[in-house]
From Swiss-Prot:
InterPro entries: Ppm1/Ppm2/Tcmp (IPR007213), SAM-dependent_MTases_sf (IPR029063). The gene is MTS1. Belongs to the methyltransferase superfamily. LCMT family. It catalyses: N-acetylserotonin + S-adenosyl-L-methionine = melatonin + S-adenosyl-L-homocysteine + H(+). PANTHER family: S-ADENOSYL-L-METHIONINE-DEPENDENT METHYLTRANSFERASE YKTD-RELATED, S-ADENOSYL-L-METHIONINE-DEPENDENT METHYLTRANSFERASES SUPERFAMILY PROTEIN. It is an enzyme of class 2 (transferase). One of its GO terms (biological process) is methylation. The keyword Transferase applies. This is O-methyltransferase 1, chloroplastic. It is found in: Plastid, Chloroplast. Pathway: Aromatic compound metabolism; melatonin biosynthesis; melatonin from serotonin: step 1/2. Keywords: Chloroplast, Melatonin biosynthesis, Methyltransferase, Plastid, S-adenosyl-L-methionine, Transferase, Transit peptide. Its EC number is 2.1.1.4.
């Protein structure tokens, strides 16, 4: 796979086991799919063709990506808040993207959690969320449309990512959704009840982000480290810098050389206000490089300019960063293939030498 061009230079200035779901049923706000016009930037026209519904793998539970105890009950609410952002954007006169499924995911009581979520900085502002979503949508569609080999897509999400439903996908695409299991199940049930279907061109497989061995879970679902892959990070609960390190270790082991990783790094509470953006990005760049990735960071202002918008104000996005990275290192699967190949060569040489004797 050829080396892909870099879309942005490095920025130097700001730019366990989960508890069961609540027993109380949530009221849904159903939204007809015909309420929105097609979005030409991501899909040809209308909604994606109807096809088989996403299938979830039987993955083990556990906790390779640890989360603080006090944050556990916010996962579902955080995913719902993101869905509300997408629904609100879809209703704008000139939206950056269309998500006709977001309203199906909403519950009437999600607004009561907004203040706490903002105080915890678990999500960016609505303005920045919409920009990041548009940026990721565009780049994802660009990469899969311009490569005949890029058919493994890993979405690292909050469990309510609707990209498998609302974006167009090439034939034989396999989308691996890595997210909190209980949130993913809740979203899948709601979408299924509303009649949402995934394109016939792709299949969606779920791997729990709470799996004790995320790498083994993805391999169990059929992920192939000898084939190119595209990784997308938006919404996956990462509460500490260590959790990001663990995630990058897994991706570095799985991603074939030349694979692409795009997304947004969340804010980590241990990064105090005294830490400036440049030093944070230096630390992130070193972390990516340790796992074999060459990374560039993208200013939020640049994304806004590219879509013809201006940020009303520079909100508190301290510690958040949009990135695009390329894997320069061989995956574990590639290294194993090389090892087996050289072993066969050595065995053949030994047999030839024995015959000569």
């Amino acid at each position: 796979m050829p080396v892909l061009p870099w879309l942005a230079a490095a920025a130097t200035t700001p730019v366990r086991r989960s508890p069961p779901l609540p027993a109380t049923p949530r009221a849904l706000l159903r939204l007809p799919a015909s309420s929105f016009p097609p979005w030409s930037n991501c899909a040809k026209s209308g909604l994606p063709p109807r096809g088989p519904f996403a299938t979830a793998a039987d993955t083990p539970l556990g906790g390779s990506l640890p989360e603080p105890e006090e944050e556990r009950d916010t996962l579902l609410d955080g995913a719902l808040r993101a869905a509300r952002f997408r629904d609100e954007e879809s209703r704008r006169p000139d939206p950056l993207f269309i998500d006709p499924y977001a309203a199906v995911l909403l519950s009437l009581d999600v607004a009561s959690e907004d203040k706490d979520l903002l105080a915890l900085h678990l999500m960016p502002s609505a303005e920045h969320y919409r920009l990041v979503t548009r940026y990721i949508d565009d780049k994802l569609q660009h990469f899969i449309s311009n490569s005949d080999d890029l058919r493994q897509i890993v979405l690292l999400t909050d469990g309510m990512d609707t990209r498998p439903y609302r974006l167009s996908w090439p034939r034989l695409s396999v989308v691996y959704d890595v997210s909190p299991r209980r949130v993913f199940i809740t979203a899948s049930q709601q979408l299924r009840g509303a009649g949402a279907k995934i394109s016939r061109n792709c299949v969606v497989l779920h791997t729990s982000s709470e799996s004790p061995d995320l790498q083994a879970g993805l391999n169990k679902n059929g992920f192939n480290g000898n084939r190119p892959s595209l990784w997308v990070l938006q919404g996956l609960p990462l509460f500490t810098f260590k959790s990001l390190e663990d995630l990058l270790l897994v991706i570095g082991n799985l991603a074939m050389k030349g694979s692409i990783f795009i997304g947004e790094v969340p804010r980590f509470t241990q990064w105090g206000a005294a830490t400036d953006m440049a030093s944070e990005q230096d630390r992130l760049e070193n972390l990516f490089f340790t796992q074999g990735f060459r990374v560039s960071f993208v200013h939020y202002e640049e994304v806004a300019k590219d879509v013809g918008l201006g940020l009303d104000s520079p909100p508190e996005i301290h510690g958040r960063a949009i990135f695009i990275a390329e894997q320069l290192r061989f995956s574990d699967a590639q290294m194993e293939s090389f090892r087996m190949h050289f072993e066969r060569i050595e065995d053949d040489a030994d047999e030839d030498g024995f015959e000569e004797l």
